[in-house]
Amino acid sequence: MHNKRVYDISIALERIKNYCALQDRCQWDVLQKLNEWGLQQATKDHILELLITDKFVDEERFAVSFSRGKFRIKNWGKRKITNELKRKQISIICINIGLNEIDNNEYKKVLEKLFHQKNNILKDKNHFTRKTKIANFLTQRGFESNLVWDKIRELSDK
């Protein structure tokens, strides 16, 4: 039902306000939804302008909540968060504001926790293979490779 075409701007505006009220949305998310509904470009621009004016859509707020959520819930690193925000066409300024919400000490604790989780799962006896697999896992999670290798060296020496 939610993906049916919408022909009335007032209905579209109410539906998109409900969509934005569920969780923070960025302009890209809203435009994707409006495109699904088959609205004309002028109508989409007008609706988006109203949503921004009424604070239903706020790129900075979105970047902050997205960064916090992906880090705390999914344990994503800053690189993966940055790439996803860029994919959603968020400005670099807003991305940096969002990433600054992540506490560096907490970031390092999560990195160490993921290191230990992966290390406990691996069955390889070869230390080189083991370190490489851990590094690949952590960089795929979006952690910076210099931090990953520093942590691997630090924890492997123990």
For each predicted feature, which ranges?
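An alpha-helical, amphipathic repeat domain used for nucleic-acid recognition
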Residues: 1-158
